Amino acid sequence: MRLLTVLIAALLAFAAPAAAAGRLDATPRTAVVSAYAPEWPALLAATTDQARYTVNGVVFVTGRMEGRPVVLFLSGVSMVNAAMTTQMALDRFAVSRIVFSGVAGGVDPALGVGDVVVADAWGQHLEGAFLREGPQGFVPGPWPPERVAGFGMIAAGPVELPRGDQPPERRFWFPADPALLQVAAWIAPAVPLKRCLAPGRCLSHQPKVVVGGRGVSGPVFVDNKAYREHVAAAFQAKVLDMETAAVAHVAYVNRTPFIAFRSLSDLAGGDEGANQIETFLTLASENSAAVVRAFVGALP
């Protein structure tokens, strides 16, 4: 009998984490996601009625932003972290839409540091294959033929999305929600963006919000002029980061509306001097947060 009691207790102990993995909050909320801590203060400061939950080390903050119910969390840097934490949020909260707010590298020569980009589709620029080198150049090898773009040995291509007994869906671009893009386009002209960090520490231009165009993400920090030019030409991308396409991928599979606001903290290797992220990270984060606040306040 004592042995049976011990076994039951052990089974209950193993079952506890599964039971705890249910919903933590039933209120329909907009998920507002950032990658890492420097992108968070302006959003947290704009959130009232805060309650905190911690799941496997990830902190989720519920509350109200511009009067709308939200849940905020940090995805963590890079693709796997972003996918993992986004799915955690979907599993534990009643997420009605996903909004990403953060900084990124600009690849469109027409854009500058401090500008905010709201891309209409996101792809993964390092999803694909590293090709074998042959006598006549790089050889495609046993890889799907619909190669999207190449940079030397790197061949980017679509991902396969499982569909049960049906053939997998092959997709490179993951779209932002059209209705959310309309809201973004409506509020964008009226949002004041910062040009200066402090007296004497100002950008040479007044930042702007750009709605539309493409963005790409990958598990590398890009600070390389040649690769930046490749991304702009091959993907017709405006912006490059390390998380958004992964979040868009998860949102697409879960049929959850998604949109991302990325403010340029640097030019991904296109800067005239050293990379500017350490100089303009705070300004870019606050510009992105300002647009997100206006966007959330305009939601129905």
What kind of region is each of these model predictions?
Residues 22-29, 54-300:
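Glycine-rich phosphate- or other oxyanion-binding loops that anchor nucleotides, phosphorylated ligands
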Residues 5-15:
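Bacterial N-terminal signal peptides
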Residues 17-20:
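Sec/Tat signal peptide C-region and signal peptidase I cleavage site
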Residues 50-52:
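N-terminal/domain-start segments enriched in small and hydrophobic, helix-friendly residues
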Residues 27-47, 64, 69:
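Short, conserved "active-site rim" segments that organize catalytic pockets and cofactor/ligand binding
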